[in-house]
Amino acid sequence: MTAITITDAAHDYLADLLEKQNTPGIGIRVFITQPGTQYAETCIAYCKPGEEKPEDKAIGLKSFTAWIDGFSEAFLDDAVVDYATDRMGGQLTIKAPNAKVPMVNADSPINERINYYLQTEINPGLASHGGQVTLIDVVEEETKNIAVLQFGGGCQGCGQADVTLKEGIERTLLERIPELSGVRDVTDHTQKENAYY
């Protein structure tokens, strides 16, 4: 069974759009840009025969094939594509509750686990100050994994950023991810116009 549901109304609407393309075998491709981050966007695009990727999963629907991006599939768990009519005609909607915050486990790559905790535990607290922190990279230094982070919004230039980094973010991440040894801030804190403190 697939992780995504395409309602009958959405199917019929998409089938009508695809028919107008005059391309035999055309389907759709569902994917997420920047999955597992606060910037995640769920997308549907036309997919002509041969445009699907090898890792895509094919879902044969009544009138066309929906290709689910292999990398996005886990983030599309419980997603629903629907079409609702209104006075202006109608609107296609995509609800993907797991697009921004994937479920991770101990076997997930370290960057996915770091992003998970940033999105679920750390950024909600920073948001009260208009700030957020983003994972830039995970680097290995002397066999130790270091998370390279960047502050944004109200955290950039904030006089308390170093305390937040060491006392809040680093402590939380080290408790949750045993193979992580530390964090590093690469933010230019000389820019203070949006700083909270």
From Swiss-Prot:
Involved in iron-sulfur cluster biogenesis. Binds a 4Fe-4S cluster, can transfer this cluster to apoproteins, and thereby intervenes in the maturation of Fe/S proteins. Could also act as a scaffold/chaperone for damaged Fe/S proteins. GO terms for biological process: iron-sulfur cluster assembly; protein maturation. Disulfide bonds: none annotated. This is Fe/S biogenesis protein NfuA. Its cofactor is [4Fe-4S] cluster. GO terms for molecular function: 4 iron, 4 sulfur cluster binding; iron ion binding. The keyword 4Fe-4S applies. Homodimer. It holds the Pfam family NifU. [4Fe-4S] cluster binds at C155, C158. Keywords: 4Fe-4S, Iron, Iron-sulfur, Metal-binding. The keyword Cell cycle does not apply. The gene is nfuA. It comes from the Bacteria. It comes from Pseudomonas syringae pv. syringae (strain B728a). Belongs to the NfuA family. InterPro entries: Fe/S_biogenesis_protein_NfuA, FeS_biogenesis, FSCA_dom_sf, HesB-like_dom_sf, NIF_FeS_clus_asmbl_NifU_C. Binds 1 [4Fe-4S] cluster per subunit. The cluster is presumably bound at the interface of two monomers.
